[in-house]
Amino acid sequence: MTPNVRPLVAGNWKMNGTRASLDQIKAMAEGVKGALSEKVDALICPPSTLLYVATALCDDSPLLIGAQDCHQNDTGAHTGDISAEMIADCFGTHVIVGHSERRTDHAETDHLVRAKASAAHQVDLIAIVCIGETADERKAGQTLDILKRQLAGSLPDEATAENTVIAYEPVWAIGTGLTPTTQDVREAHAFMRDELVKRFGDAGKTMRILYGGSVKPANALELMGVENVDGALIGGASLKAADFLSIYAAYEQLTA
């Protein structure tokens, strides 16, 4: 954790979830009510088909709702895409950009991710900018070089601690059950913090840096307790309310 930084526990449902899944969001919305919500933010990013209904379900809950991607343009002939303005119109508060699955499946570049983050900022959405190295890059000892390049290329100049969150997701750890050691996480997050401070000054000291990659109830407390880890971006474990709330509850000990 970073002193004086409010943690964020975020769930990315990816291409999962139908109307029947709204029961899980209802349970999460109830589960995050209480004293811990005054210290820790909770966010779920369902598929776009559920975005508006999910925000309505959370109207009287501190549970935040966001989207998984946005187009870099406001409007236009972009079949199948969703704009940042559309997300804001559905009362979403956050949007994930640059997830490794988007970078791989859709060949998204740092330049494009940067444009998407800027589009989010234009309509007062908080951009969650994802970065991380592949297994081959890790084996080649390139982790820090990749993080430096992606931070420099993916973050727009107007990024602040208020409108931007960084999510470090080692690509090789996503959905594999593999996780880096706490020392690996500590070194990566310390490096990113230094890079953010070099570029953004004091704002870089309090930008939230999340860890993502096979986060689950069994390892949440250990991972979230690492210095400069300001929360989690959770995949599969966010699909069930019980698992998501268990990870969220790790902060009951960490913030005591």
Curated annotation (Swiss-Prot):
Keyword check for RNA-binding: no
Q: Which GO terms describe its molecular function?
A: triose-phosphate isomerase activity
The source's domain of life comes to Bacteria
Keyword annotations for this protein?
Cytoplasm, Gluconeogenesis, Glycolysis, Isomerase
Chief location: cytoplasm
The active site of this protein is located at H99, E169
Q: Which reaction does it catalyse?
A: D-glyceraldehyde 3-phosphate = dihydroxyacetone phosphate
Protein's cellular compartments: Cytoplasm
Where is substrate annotated to bind?
Answer: N12, W13, K14, G175, S214, G235, G236
| Pathway membership | Carbohydrate biosynthesis; gluconeogenesis; Carbohydrate degradation; glycolysis; D-glyceraldehyde 3-phosphate from glycerone phosphate: step 1/1
Per the record, GO CC terms? cytosol
Question: Enzyme group, top EC level?
Answer: isomerase
- Describe the subunit structure: Homodimer.
Q: Which NCBIfam families match?
A: tim
Q: Which PANTHER family match?
A: TRIOSEPHOSPHATE ISOMERASE
Protein's job:
Involved in the gluconeogenesis. Catalyzes stereospecifically the conversion of dihydroxyacetone phosphate (DHAP) to D-glyceraldehyde-3-phosphate (G3P).
Which protein family is it in? Answer: Belongs to the triosephosphate isomerase family.
Return the protein name.
Triosephosphate isomerase
Protein's organism: Agrobacterium fabrum (strain C58 / ATCC 33970) (Agrobacterium tumefaciens (strain C58))
Encoding gene per record? tpiA
